């Protein structure tokens, strides 16, 4: 399954379109009555959604409401039920995919937003991987934690120059923290969960400060 946060060389709308496969995977898993796989696929959608939700909300509050406040919580809750009604949740995910595709089509033909919103989306898309690390560690899923951090490192190369231009201090702190996380998480057979979690939190704080500032600039310029 291709992640829609992994790499993006075109427009943000192009990056957003790659979110659809996670919903398609959820549908396929439900059709095959594979609930565990459906949960994993929808979790992947949810993680990626964090990267694009500000962009979507700015584009259309109605679309945001449907996806974020109606479909997403309803499907998430349904997937957690011990006696899952597969046909019911399948209908919801299929309807969500239709709404998602309609939104992408609308955004593609709309007047471009302030370019700063593209920057916000790029920053958040990359950050989505880092957000996955701590929950994976706490769940004891070391493989996922490592994979998510490696994906964050991969995406970082696409935006590190932008971050550096925004804040040299934040850039240096993120770079330093990433080296420390790599040593503690990737190079250790038995990582210290508390230590790695602390390091991830430190990088996240620095990264979030840049995201927050760029979001403020985007809203002021809109």
PLM features: what roles do these ranges have?
Residues 1-222:
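Mature extracytoplasmic or organellar-lumen-exposed domains after removal of signal/transit peptides
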